Amino acid sequence: MSPKTETKAGTGFKAGVKDYKLTYYTPDYVVKDTDILAAFRMTPQPGVPPEECGAAVAAESSTGTWTTVWTDGLTSLDRYKGRCYDLEPVAGEENQYIAYVAYPIDLFEEGSVTNLFTSIVGNVFGFKALRALRLEDLRIPVAYVKTFQGPPHGIQVERDKLNKYGRPLLGCTIKPKLGLSAKNYGRACYECLRGGLDFTKDDENVNSQPFMRWRDRFLFVAEAIFKSQSETGEIKGHYLNATAATCEEMLKRAAYAKELGVPIIMHDYLTGGFTANTSLAAYCRDNGLLLHIHRAMHAVIDRQKNHGIHFRVLAKALRLSGGDHLHSGTVVGKLEGEREVTLGFVDLMRDDYIEKDRSRGVYFTQDWCSMGGVMPVASGGIHVWHMPALTEIFGDDSCLQFGGGTLGHPWGNAPGAVANRVALEACVQARNEGRDLAREGNDVIRAACKWSPELAAACEVWKEIKFEFETIDTL
């Protein structure tokens, strides 16, 4: 049996909490290549030793409970237990630590983000001995990565399907997000697509409401896609939101989209759930549909610095579960996102191999072992004046999505789309000529205004619009 431990009362927690550190705090442990590694930002209750808290996190997220039980003797805890193998004080924070925990791979079902999260971010987050707990990062070993399908297609296959290379893709979320009839909604999509955008998008809360049922929306949007394609000679798409009350209904909507011949559908992966998302990603891979992922609800989970789950973990989970696009913030728009932190998890979404880099919040080296990449989507409060910064920050393998920044154009949707496309092409050309967009971006946009009245009108409307607030979640 595992060694019995003394139950004692201590400051900050009630009698009956045992000393986890005797079994689960192992600073001499040598990490295995197959271990799943977690970095937790941990704030103990006053009087609780950090070693005890780190061990408690390891125990309660793996094999442990609050007392020794006789059935411990029926298995090998040394083989299956999580281990807190390192503690690191957080600079500038009193009584806060990064606890590093190693989990044996055998604790987790193959190919299941749901099972992975149920253990690692489960009941332990309500543990009384902890004032706060946040999962900052996960290292997914190659042996576990290979049990997942990952993105249905990935960045390169998407570009091949769309026949679009050498620039970011352009999108637009249709507004108002709720209340339009299906026919008017389809017309708004058509105007944006014929104006030069690659995609339009359902808002995350557009499902199948009384004012616009899903089947009607799918039909009118498909008409908009095909009409704009025939006029422009470019492949177009619209993120048809297949999120539904049940998995069965979700897959029915996906099947109807395939029947219509549209190239891409959409899912709200956090509100819809990882099980549903993985099922939908498998359907998309089998049926040639691209899958756009919205992160609605993420800020409830990731925005607080001391408690919850950092978005880089949610992004890794999405890459495992499956998605071709994922919203990732803008750095410069209306939504939360520090530059270096954002670039850190954008690389984790797109690249094959990412080195540990604490300056960008990357706690572990991550090898995706040739799993397809996820295209980051920059969306939220952006307009034409942001185009140079967005092009410079996100690079070519990204989708820049302007909702109000397209539909708010004084001349209408199509001129708004023209303005965005002209601004993007001007920025890409300037970058390819070797110009510094960070320094010369505004000059590039002003020069393009001289031969694009649509862009000039957009620049005039949004010349004073800025979202300059301090980021809450900093390194």
From Swiss-Prot:
Active site (UniProt): K175 (proton acceptor), H294 (proton acceptor)
Keyword annotations of the record: Acetylation, Calvin cycle, Carbon dioxide fixation, Chloroplast, Disulfide bond, Lyase, Magnesium, Metal-binding, Methylation, Monooxygenase, Oxidoreductase, Photorespiration, Photosynthesis, Plastid
GO molecular function, one term: ribulose-bisphosphate carboxylase activity
PROSITE patterns, per database record: RUBISCO_LARGE
Binding, substrate: N123, T173, K177, R295, H327, S379
Superkingdom of this protein's organism: Eukaryota
Cited CDD domains: RuBisCO_large_I
Catalytic reactions of this protein: 2 (2R)-3-phosphoglycerate + 2 H(+) = D-ribulose 1,5-bisphosphate + CO2 + H2O; D-ribulose 1,5-bisphosphate + O2 = 2-phosphoglycolate + (2R)-3-phosphoglycerate + 2 H(+)
Propeptide boundaries: 1-2
NCBIfam families in the record: PRK04208.1
Note: The basic functional RuBisCO is composed of a large chain homodimer in a 'head-to-tail' conformation. In form I RuBisCO this homodimer is arranged in a barrel-like tetramer with the small subunits forming a tetrameric 'cap' on each end of the 'barrel'.
Quaternary structure (record): Heterohexadecamer of 8 large chains and 8 small chains; disulfide-linked. The disulfide link is formed within the large subunit homodimers.
Listed name of the protein: Ribulose bisphosphate carboxylase large chain
Classification lineage: Eukaryota, Viridiplantae, Streptophyta, Mesostigmatophyceae, Mesostigmatales
Record gene name: rbcL
